[in-house]
């Protein structure tokens, strides 16, 4: 027990040390990303639409700017999904979309062959309506999805920029991915897991951010799956000290977003969110309600978790939870 406490104190210290006085984390930048992705211009980012493709191009631009390496000569992983033709007046039941993916190579000669994945889906429900997942199916209006999940992508890009700024790669390699097709049934993550660009056994942990932009007054950040890798619950609680957050950590309770796809394939996961709200899957999920200061606290916490896990001293083995 004494050894374990020392281990987590050291890990937390090292991770916190990486966020320097010159940190790039900024609520203003977080809000800038969210404002663009949740703008009416992108019309709700429904998979297979122009707005969805424009969101992908925006994410790709920052993946390239912040130095991520490509898999297979490109940042896009294209795939097709089947949609009900009546959703958003889509003319065909088969539409093309893409995951956006790149990686940061690890610094340890051996451990860089292992991968930690951090991701957030970027699609939403377009104009809503019949056949969609909108809670107001009789209302035809743009569902901007500022929290679901422009906020997760804003955190993803904020974390990536911090890695680029620090220019210090952790021991293991890190895959950054933004999924499409999540709303239709985790389709982007399912495609990715069945078409991995690396060996499945090399993928050790997947961290997923879905709806992290509405931090409440109690500063509660909820997470499930922390018990799916060794000492994960202890780590995630320890990282909460001095973070300005109150992590609500579950060993199991894996949830229902893209990380579930990885868990079902025996890959350790953590799924993070700031809680539900009445605007979920409605046209009212807008940027005006985003807590950008809270979003940056969450981004810093997840950055520290990612650094800690990518530098984990002990083997990262999958632990099944009930």
Outline where the language-model segments fall:
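Second-shell loop/turn segments in exported
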Residues: 23, 40-50, 86-91, 138-149, ...
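His/Asp/Glu-rich mid-to-C-terminal helical/loop segments that flank catalytic regions of hydrolases
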Residues: 165, 278-322
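Acidic/His- and Gly-rich active-site-bordering loop/insert found
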Residues: 37, 63, 84, 90-132
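N-terminal hydrophobic or amphipathic helices/low-complexity stretches enriched
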Residues: 17-70, 113, 319-322
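Metal-dependent peptidase/peptidase-like ectodomains
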Residues: 179-277, 317
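A non-catalytic alpha/beta surface segment that caps or lines the substrate-entry region
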Residues: 45-105
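Bacterial Sec-dependent N-terminal signal peptides
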Residues: 1-25
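Alpha-helical metal-binding/catalytic segments enriched in His/Glu/Asp
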Residues: 111-112, 118-119, 123-124, 128-184, ...
């Amino acid at each position: 027990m004494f050894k374990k406490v020392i281990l987590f104190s050291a890990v937390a210290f090292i991770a916190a040390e990486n966020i320097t006085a010159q940190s790039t984390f900024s609520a203003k930048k977080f809000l800038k990303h969210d404002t663009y992705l949740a703008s009416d211009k992108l019309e709700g980012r429904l998979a297979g639409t122009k707005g969805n493709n424009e969101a992908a191009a925006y994410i790709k631009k920052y993946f390239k700017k912040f130095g991520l390496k490509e898999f297979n000569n490109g940042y896009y992983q294209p795939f097709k999904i089947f949609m009900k033709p009546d959703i958003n007046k889509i003319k065909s039941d088969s539409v093309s979309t893409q995951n956006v993916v790149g990686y940061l190579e690890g610094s340890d000669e051996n451990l860089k062959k292992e991968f930690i994945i951090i991701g957030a889906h970027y699609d939403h429900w377009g104009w809503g309506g019949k056949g969609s997942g909108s809670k107001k199916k009789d209302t035809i209006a743009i569902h901007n999805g500022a929290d679901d999940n422009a906020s997760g992508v804003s955190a993803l890009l904020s974390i990536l920029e911090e890695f680029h700024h620090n220019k210090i790669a952790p021991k293991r390699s890190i895959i950054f991915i933004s999924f499409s097709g999540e709303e239709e049934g985790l389709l982007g993550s399912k495609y990715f897991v069945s078409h991995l660009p690396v060996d499945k056994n090399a993928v050790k942990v997947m961290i997923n951010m879905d709806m992290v932009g509405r931090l409440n007054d109690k500063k509660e950040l909820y997470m499930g799956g922390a018990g799916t890798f060794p000492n994960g619950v202890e780590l995630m609680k320890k990282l909460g000290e001095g973070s300005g957050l109150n992590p609500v950590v579950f060993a199991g309770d894996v949830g229902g977003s893209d990380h579930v796809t990885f868990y079902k394939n025996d890959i350790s996961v953590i799924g993070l969110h700031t809680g539900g709200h009445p605007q979920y899957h409605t046209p009212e999920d807008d940027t005006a309600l985003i807590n950008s200061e809270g979003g940056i606290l969450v981004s810093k916490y997840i950055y520290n978790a990612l650094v800690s896990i990518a530098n984990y001293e002990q083997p990262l083995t999958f632990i099944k939870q009930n």
